[in-house]
Amino acid sequence: MKRQTRKAILAIFACTALAIDAGAGEQNRMTVSFNEKNVLQSITVGAATFATGGGDLWTAEFSDGTNRAKRVKACAHEAATCTRTETDAVLTLTWRDVPLGGERGVLDATVTIEKRPDGSQAWNLAFANRSPRWTLMTTAFPRLNRVTPDGAGDVLLPSNDHGAQIFRKRTVQPKPFRRAYLGYCPMIAGFFLGTDGLYFVPEDPEARIKNLLVEGEQNACYETTVENAGVPGRAAEGPRYPVVLAPLKGDWWSFARRYRAYALKQKWAARGPIKDIPDYPRRLCEIPLWINIHGYPDVASNILTRAKAIFPGFSTGLHWHLWQHSGHDVNYPEYFPAQPGTKECIAYCESMGQEPMPYVNGRLWSAPTSGFILAEPYAVLRQNDTRYVEKYGRLTAPLAVMCPTCAPWQKVVRTFTGRILDELGAKSIFIDQIGAAPGVPCYDPAHGHPLGGGAWWREGYEKMMEPIHRAWNAKGAFITTEGSGEMCLNMVDGYLQVVVRDPKDVPFHNAVYSGYTTYFCSPENNDDDPAAFRALQTRELLWGNALGWFLPDILDKPDKCAILNQLCAFRQKNLDALAYGNLLDELRFAEPVGKTTYEWLGRRPHHSLYDPAYKLPPSKFATLADVRGNWWRTADGKVVLLAANLTDREQRVVYRVYGTDKTAVLVLAPHELVRIKGA
C-alpha cells in the first residue's frame, strides 16, 4: 500500500546482500537515507557511512530545439515541490515544476528506487518535459557526493586493459576522473571503508554511450547523452537504464564477483565459455607469447624464425604492422596492395607453427585520401555539424571516426578483412580500436540511428562484425581487437592489451570474463632489470594473460628470454586454468611476508629503436609480495592455486586456503612456480 511520507529523514530498504561465489562471511547490510527535500543524506553499509555530501541527486542539460549549442541546466534543488511515496518494494521521489530556461511549470523529474531480492537497489531517472522550446540532451545521475571522506577510502575505478585500478586512501584530486564507455573501460565504481563496500554500477544490457565522472571529494555520477538528444518531441525521457547500488563485504574481489554474475547474463557473453564454443579457435588462447613489430615481410619472417629458435617449445605470435603498402596510421582503409612477399611470409611463418597477425583499423578513415571524398558522409557528425576527426601524433594526418551503423562503411571493413583472409591466407587478424575507443555521439540524421546517444554504436559494430567473425572462424582463423571492451565479447575471439602496466592495476576483466575470452600481452620496457621484468611478467601470467607485445629486441636479451621460456612453459602446463578457467581470488597470507620494490621503466615505442635521443616517460615503482599467487577454477571445476617465488631466495609462507578457514604452508625454491590443489 502506498503512503505519503512525512517531512523527516527516512531510512529506506535496510537489507542484507549475499556476495556471489564468495567465501564465508561476505555479506553486508545497506541503508539509504533522504531528507524532506529528497536530498540524499547518507548510505550506510555495515559499520561504514558513504555519500554524506548531500547536493543534487540529478542534474540535466537541455538544448534549444533550434540550436543544440544553446544549453540550460536543470537541477534537483530548484524544484518547486518535492514529494515521496513508498511501498515495500519501491521508493518514488518526485520533483515538480523544475525551472527550465526561464520557463516554469514545464518540467518534472521522477526517481524510482527498486529493492531487489539480492539486497541491491536499482535507481532510475525519468523526466516529464512539457516545454515547447527546451529538449533533453544529457543527464548526470545518480549524483553521490563525498562518497568516501578525503584520504579515508579505497576506490575502485575503471582503467584501460585490465579494467580497473584500486586507489588506496584516495584523496581529493586536482582534475576530474572521467572515463567513457564502449571502449577500454567498464562502467564501474566501487568504494570501500575497511571491509565495508558500496557497489555503484549501471546495468545497461543495451550498452548505451555513457561516462563515469568522479571529481572533488569522491563525487560520483554517470553521465548520459540521451537517445535523440535535442530532437523536439523525440528525445528520450532519461538515461533508460538503472544504476545499481549494492552493499559489499570484503575488497574489490567481492565487487568483481557481483559484476561477473551480472555480466555473464548479457548478450555479449551469450556464446558461453570458450571451452564450449565448437568453432572457437583455441590456437589463440594457447599462444603464450607475442612480439610487436613495424616491419616489412622479410623483417617479419626473420623475427619469427629467430623466435622459433629461442622459444622452441611453443608458438610465438606477431602483431604485424606494415604488411600493407603504406605506413602506420596512413591511407586507412586503403591497405592493399600488400607489400611484396606478404602472402609468402604468412605461409612460411605458419608452416613453422608461428602466428603472423596483420594489423588493420576498424574505426578510422584517413581524411586526406581521395576515397574520403566519397566516405565523408558516413563519418560521425558532431553537434556543430563538423565530422569527428582525431590525430595521433604530430606527424600523422587527420583520421575521421566512421559511424559503425553506416552500411557502406561496414562493407568496406568486410571487404579488406575478407581479402586478408582469402587472398593472403592469414589465419588471424587484429582489428584495431573497435574494442578500445569509446562510443561517440553522432548527430547525422542520414545515418538512420537515434541522434546523440543510445545503443546504436554497439548495434552497428555487431552488424558489421557478425559476418566477418563467422567467415574467419569457419576457416579456423581468429579475430582480435585492442583493449578489453566487453561489448565486443561476441564479435572477436580475444583482446590484445597494449597499455603500460601500473602498480595500481587489478585483474578486473580477468576476474569477470576469464574463460569467456582470451586476454593477451603484458607490455614492458625490455630494458627493465631482470628482477623487475620477472615480477611484472609473473603478475600478468598468474592473472591469466598470455605474455608479450615486446619490441623485437627482446630476442637479443638472453636473460629475459630465459625468464619468458620458464613462464610460458608454466602457462602451457596450466591451460585448463589460465586459458579456460575462472580467476577466483588472490593468494592471501596468514602471516606477514617479505616485499620488494621494483622499478618499471617508462614505455619504449617502436620508433625508439631508431631514435637514440628518445626520452623515456617516468618510471613506475611497484612494491610486491615476494610470493605471488592466484586461485583458479579449472575448466573441469577443480580449484587450484598457481603461485610463484619472485625472488632468488627460498621463501616460506603461510596462506589461507580459498573457500575454507584453513591455513597451509608453502615453501618455494628461488624463482619456482607451482600448482597446488585447493580444498
What are these model-predicted stretches?
Residues 401-491:
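Active-site neighborhood of glycoside hydrolase catalytic domains
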